[in-house]
């Protein structure tokens, strides 16, 4: 027997990077590139543990770990975003588009909750896909990103559902913590 039937949830809230879109490797490469001028080599595993956190937070963590000043944060984030947008090779995971269409056809409310900026999300040229979501929550809409619960709480609020009526689909430790803190 299924302990968590999907029918108990009115809303499904999805992360984007690494859940719907195959973006993890492109993101890692962009972060690694952005730190080269500072003599910092980022390990793939280190980045994946931070995936989902706001970009400025990720930059701060790597700068502090390497005993560099946080005055470089904005330059690093800008370099990372520009590199990502110029070099990405975006695609969805298999079955994602069909899953979203099926959930909508079965009356589920859908939210996309991502730490990415609105500009970066729109830069993926998937507007028709994004239009299937009832709510989009991007990193620039919240004052505290993942692992803080604010992004998922805002998603539930905008969908007009309680947190117990929400199911979160996440891949990253920061996002999972965010969802748990939001009691989803």
Identify the function of each model-found stretch:
Residues 20, 92, 110, 144, ...:
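Conserved SAM-binding loop
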Residues 1-46, 181:
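Active-site neighborhood of HAD-like aspartate-dependent phosphohydrolases
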Residues 34-35, 54-68, 156:
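Helix-loop "lid/cap" segments that line or gate small-molecule binding pockets
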Residues 2-3, 8, 85-112:
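Short, acidic loop-to-helix structural element flanking the phosphoryl-transfer center
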Residues 63-98:
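Metal-dependent phosphoesterase signature
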Residues 117-167, 173-181:
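Substrate-recognition "cap/lid" segment bordering the active-site pocket of phosphatases
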Residues 19, 114-116:
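Conserved phosphate-coupling serine/threonine residues in phosphotransfer and NTP-handling enzymes
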């Amino acid at each position: 027997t299924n302990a968590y039937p999907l029918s108990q949830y009115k809303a499904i809230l999805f992360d984007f990077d690494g859940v719907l879109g195959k973006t993890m490797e492109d993101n890692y490469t962009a972060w690694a590139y952005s730190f080269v001028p500072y003599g910092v080599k980022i390990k793939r595993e280190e980045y994946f543990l931070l995936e989902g956190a706001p970009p400025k937070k990720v930059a701060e963590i790597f700068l502090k770990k390497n005993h560099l000043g946080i005055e470089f944060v904005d330059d690093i984030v800008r370099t990372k975003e520009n590199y990502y947008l110029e070099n990405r090779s975006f695609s969805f995971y298999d079955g994602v588009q069909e899953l979203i269409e099926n959930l909508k056809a079965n009356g589920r409310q859908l939210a996309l909750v991502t730490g990415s900026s609105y500009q970066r999300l729109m830069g993926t040229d998937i507007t028709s896909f994004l239009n299937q979501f009832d709510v989009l929550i991007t990193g620039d809409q919240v004052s505290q990103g993942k692992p803080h619960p604010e992004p998922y709480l805002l998603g539930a609020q905008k969908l007009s559902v309680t947190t117990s009526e929400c199911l979160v689909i996440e891949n990253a430790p920061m996002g999972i913590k965010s969802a748990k803190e939001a009691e989803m």
